Amino acid sequence: MKTLYKSLLAFVAWVMLSVSALAVDVIVVSHGQANDPFWSVAKNGVDKGCKDMGVSCKYTAPATFDMVEMAKLIDNAVSQKPKGIVITLPDAAALGKSVKAAIAAGIPVISMNSGSDDYASLGISAHVGQTEFEAGVGGGQKMKAAGGKKALCVNHEVGNVALDRRCAGFKKGFGGSVDILGTSNDPTEIQKAVAAKLGGGYDTILTLGAGLAGEAALKALEAAGKVGSVKLGTFDMSPGMLKAAAAGKVEFLIDQQQYLQGYLPIAIFGQYMRYGTMPAGVVMTGPGFVTPDNAAKVIKWAAQGCLLYTSPSPRDTTA
């Protein structure tokens, strides 16, 4: 009997140690998949932050842009009782209940990438990213200065409030006619949709993501022989769009530094676990602009999986 009792105690101790070893300090719930060119860079930042801070992390995301599934992932993260949760916040209305449940459970939450205008209303203390409307204003101002009169804003994630704000900011900065083209996130479909619009007198195109929409729009312009005559700019960066910028085919890429958006929340939680302190407000990682003048020096960083801040953006003091 004593032998059995000792064996049971040993088994319970082993289970407790195993659970402790499997416990996750920080869970990241993103709307972007780690195999997406943009989000793979953000995940690299998460991984490096976890290594540098000595914390265990888990990166999760729905298979597609799906707010119902993302809310379930946040709920699941809460049930695991981590020391912190990092989320993107593309739709505060859809995710608000789950975020508030995490905070009510005593789990601190940091938002990154999407959500600069909404994080505080949900009780989140800090956001890491760029202010989307202001970034759009800067892009619009650049296209206006380049002589643009009629623009197309290509939205590949319809329902993502952050992308809506990018287009709204672009429209304000541009000042001319701006139409919104809603698409799926399939590059082939985006290319076809942009190609179908090229006969509509557009002299300017802004895409809201480089790896999917930006490269697809560039292919449409190349196929139609309109590179240069139709100005193209994009949010975010990808190796293909960086090369296009270096070749003078793209007016600008708006760099929000997604590597830092992944890294900094983990670093913040690392310090929080040690000292109990956390910054408040928006920790700005962008926007910065990559242009044909500075694209070459940025390409070397892209090859290493991190895209770094390049230059300050124009500010719109009336926003």
Residue map of PLM features:
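Single conserved hydrophobic/aromatic residue that forms the stacking wall/gate
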Residues: 309-319
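Flexible loop/hinge segments that line or gate small-molecule binding clefts
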Residues: 92-134, 236-251, 299-301
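Short beta-strand elements in bilobed, periplasmic/extracellular small-molecule ligand-binding domains
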Residues: 53-62, 153, 173-187
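Extracytoplasmic "Venus flytrap"
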Residues: 25-45, 49, 53, 58-74, ...
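Hydrophobic alpha-helical segments within soluble ligand-binding/sensing domains
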Residues: 70, 126-151, 187-191, 237-241, ...
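Sec/Tat signal peptide C-region and signal peptidase I cleavage site
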Residues: 19-23
